[in-house]
Each structure stands twice: as structure tokens, then as C-alpha cells.
Amino acid sequence: NVGNVVAITIDDGVDSSVVDAYLDFAKDSGVRLTFFVTGCYPSWTDNRDKMRPLVESGQIQLANHTWTHPDLTTLSEGGIIDELTQCENLLRNTYGVTGAPFIRPPYGGRSSYTDSVCAKIGYTTTTMWYGSFGDSGLLTPEVLLGEAQKWLLAQHIVIGHANFPTVTSVYGQIIDILRQRSLQTATLDDVYFGPGHNRHV
């Protein structure tokens, strides 16, 4: 039922152990996740062997969050293309997939100009969010859960971050929220293209 779907999207990947814990969470719970990869962080190669089967099955989708997390509105056309291309190359070389068409601009920094430059290289869907775990910085489990309670609702794209370990202590409570609300999780591919979308290159 499309009406009861929420898309949980996880950005950055500063902390490799948090990415690893998210993979356990996905394997143990069946939750479907979209990672917006910031390619310069080692977590995306550190966790390759564990992540690849989940990417292959489509339970986890990988999308582009640039190489070094700059505000795209401060860059030239060449700078934007370089940031996206380096991350795209990582996704292709490490996982055999493309991140296109989904780009999430760091800090939400976008304009009609940045959108048009991204589209030139296949990144036609600038993906923002409606709701956040609030965990781009360090916060307490109680605050994070409060944000999860507030935003894990049908038809929402919710943003979290793989940067600090707080979220890893509340996975059980996140599952409880999803079950209480009869919510199904979906990747962006599930929502935009339907199950089984092939992003192999």
C-alpha cells in the first residue's frame, strides 16, 4: 500500500561503525534504506563486503551526496560536476551501481542553476526531505527518538545521518514506531520506479 510508505534516507557516513550498524539493522529488521553517500569517507569502502549483498538485493539503495560535502551553490559548474562524478565513480567501482538520478545537495544548498548542472550528468532528481532525526550533530537518544516520533509518517522522506553512534542505540524503538503506525519502509527506487529497479552498470 503506497499510502503507508515512508522512505528513510541516511546521509554522509562520517563514522564507519555507524554505517556498519545500519547494515545490521537492515539485515535484522528487513528495513529498506537509501544511503546518500559522501564518497570521501572510508566507511563506504570499509563496509563494502557486508553492504554489497544488500545493494544487490535492492534492500539498500546508494545515491549521491557528493565527494566532500560542499555547498553546491558556492561551486562553479566544473566544481559541481567533479563532486558528483567522483562520488559516482566510487559507487560504480565499489558496488557496480549508479547513484543517478538521485542527488541530495549538502546542507540542502541548491538553486535552479545547481539543479541544471546536476541534470547534465544524469542527476535529474534533487532529493530533499520532509522530516529529520536531527542527528547531523551529536544528540541524546531521547531527542533523536522524539524527532523519529514526530516525522516517521506515511509519505515522508526522512533524513538521518551515519555520523554519530546515538542512532544505533534506538533501532528497536524505531522499529516499534514503524510497526505501531503500520508503516512500510521503501527506497527511493521503490517509490519512483517500483520494486526490482535495476541500477547496475
Role assignments for model-derived ranges:
Residues 13, 38-40, 67, 106-108, ...:
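Active-site beta-loop-alpha junctions enriched in small/polar residues
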Residues 77-82, 142, 165-168:
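Non-membrane alpha-helical structural segments and their capping/turn regions in soluble enzymes
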Residues 34-36, 61-63, 104, 126-127, ...:
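Structural detector of well-ordered beta-strand residues that form the stable sheet scaffold
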